[in-house]
From Swiss-Prot:
Classification via Pfam families: Intron_maturas2, MatK_N
Keyword Plastid included in the entry's annotation: yes
Organism: Hordeum vulgare subsp. vulgare
Subcellular location: Plastid, Chloroplast
Name this protein carries in UniProt: Maturase K
Main function: Usually encoded in the trnK tRNA gene intron. Probably assists in splicing its own and other chloroplast group II introns.
A GO biological-process term: tRNA processing
Source superkingdom: Eukaryota
Length: 511
């Protein structure tokens, strides 16, 4: 416990000061506008109704928040707009979005400075290839073959945002900035019942993307920080060997008595809680904890995580958010793939002199397949096909040129093939390609007010095949490979590319 408190105090000593004055700098809101809101003018901001705004008004907003009459209005009229007067500042929600984006940029500065201040001898070497999302799959393929159980964790999120503000106190010791953050969270809470309405939570995340990402990453970083510490400490807490004693309740007392009777007894270590073959992977609000221990060990980790969230973060998480599965008998959804470690039978012929033997053995294999139902659901949601996978036209794209239509369909198809190239079964990918190809033909036929049959007879099937086929040189693992996206044929090899650094546009490239 003393080590834990010392470790925590060491982190508190890294707190950063003087964040709040940066909120009054003009360039902060220029950055927020350019990068957070995808605008074009850094100083003057154009709203949705083409009315011009200046980021100077945002600084006035901060000053006005701390005026007495403004605070009185916030308390006496909680349902009214408490940020700005519409007659003066037009849209308060727009300015609150600007200010939240600017605040997110400011509070990210201390974390960036911490990385820059890291000594060179302690820096982790940065390999460009390790940035790829696919780089994790060769690791899983190498490690999961030797593991037994897997815990699939849905990382809980605190429903009360005050917990997130308190977590920032470990990293940022700036009272005005924390008060400003509380103001925004309370504003959205009272304005649209943020705490109780899931719809309001989604609205807050949509309107304040950068701030929500920062709060979530801070929370996950805090929980993983102490989780890593406790994991390391558990490996340094050897328990005495208990093979002689069946009753663990009186283990300590018996061991002391045993030591008195046999002074020369040498204690052995038992890695009871911590197995050296344990791996932790986090992705998209989920995490995987795999180990080679027994089912009892995994249940201990599950109870530990539930109690950890309850007593450290002060909120209850349901035990059903942690699923314990045996790797040999189950599959798990991981970053757009359905992965499993099945045991495949292998028949080996052994020849000894004049006699031959057939040896039937089983080998583990890390298998990854593409979830067809999920991907067809994405295509159906984007109106490329029906729910059953029947291709339809894309009416909203009929105003584009033929080249733009072909380019969009071809890019989506190439992205799907590129990301899901690690699938051991390519039949689903060819089915998706067929849907996109026919949907493209129907879109072009609808644009030219013709039928698909007439359109294909006039241009030929090779016309679409040309745009859905691309040869590209990709550095895959340690070799160069030419990938041909042909419509026919079968490819069973699995390829992991090292140039994929984003997942949203690849796993779900239609949104």
């Amino acid at each position: 416990m003393e080590k834990f408190e010392g470790y925590s105090e060491k982190q508190k000593s890294r707190q950063q000061y003087f964040v709040y004055p940066l909120l009054f700098q003009e360039y902060i809101y220029a950055f927020a506008h350019d990068y957070g809101l995808n605008g074009s003018e850094p100083v003057e901001i154009v709203s949705w109704n083409n009315k011009k705004f200046s980021s100077l008004l945002v600084k006035r907003l901060i000053i006005r928040m701390y005026q007495q009459n403004f605070l009185d209005n916030s308390v006496n009229h909680p349902n009214q707009d408490r940020l700005l007067d519409y007659k003066i500042f037009f849209y308060s929600e727009f300015y609150s979005q600007i200010l939240s984006e600017g605040f997110a940029i400011v509070v990210e500065i201390p974390f960036s400075l911490r990385e820059l201040s890291c000594p060179k001898e302690k820096e982790i070497p940065k390999f460009q290839n390790l940035r790829s999302i696919h780089s994790i799959f060769p690791f899983l393929e190498d490690k999961f073959l030797h593991l037994d159980y897997l815990s699939h964790i849905e990382i809980p999120y605190p429903i009360h945002l005050e917990i997130l503000v308190q977590l920032l106190q470990y990293r940022i010791q700036d009272v005005p900035s924390l008060h400003l953050l509380r103001f925004f969270l309370n504003y959205y809470s009272n304005w649209n019942s943020f705490i109780t309405s899931m719809k309001s939570i989604l609205f807050f995340q949509k309107e304040n993307k950068r701030l929500v990402k920062f709060l979530y990453n801070s929370y996950v970083s805090e929980y993983e920080f102490f989780l890593l510490f406790l994991r390391k400490q558990s490996s340094c807490l050897p328990l005495a060997y208990s093979g002689t004693f069946l009753e663990r309740i009186h283990f300590s007392r018996k061991m002391e008595h045993f030591g008195i009777m046999y002074p020369g007894f040498s204690r052995k270590t038992l890695w009871f809680f911590m197995d050296p073959l344990i791996h932790y992977v986090r992705y998209q609000g989920k995490a995987i904890l795999a180990s080679k221990g027994s089912f009892f060990l995994k249940k201990k980790w599950k109870c530990y995580l539930i109690n950890f969230w309850q007593y450290y973060f002060f909120f209850w998480t349901q035990p059903r958010r942690i699923h314990i599965n045996q790797l040999a008998n189950s599959c798990f959804d991981f970053m757009g793939y359905l992965s499993s470690v099945p045991k495949s039978p292998l028949l080996v012929r052994n020849q000894m002199l004049e006699n031959s033997f057939l040896i039937d053995t089983r080998m583990k294999k890390f298998d990854t397949i593409v979830p067809a139902t999920l991907l067809i659901g994405y295509l159906s949601k984007a109106q490329f096909c029906t729910g059953s996978g029947h291709p339809i036209s894309k009416p909203i794209w009929t105003d584009l040129s033929d080249w733009d239509i072909l380019d969009r369909f071809g890019r989506i198809c190439r992205n799907l093939f590129h990301y899901h190239s690690g699938s051991s079964k390519k039949r689903t990918l060819y089915r998706l390609k067929y849907i996109l190809r026919l949907s493209c033909a129907r879109t072009l036929a609808r644009k030219h007010k013709s039928t698909v049959r007439t359109f294909m007879q006039r241009l030929g099937s090779a016309f679409l095949e040309e745009f859905f086929t691309e040869e590209e040189q990709v550095f895959s693992l340690m070799f160069t490979k030419t990938t041909l996206f042909s419509f026919s044929g079968s490819h069973t090899e699995r390829i992991w590319y090292l140039d994929i650094i984003g997942i949203n546009d690849l796993v779900n490239p239609l949104n």
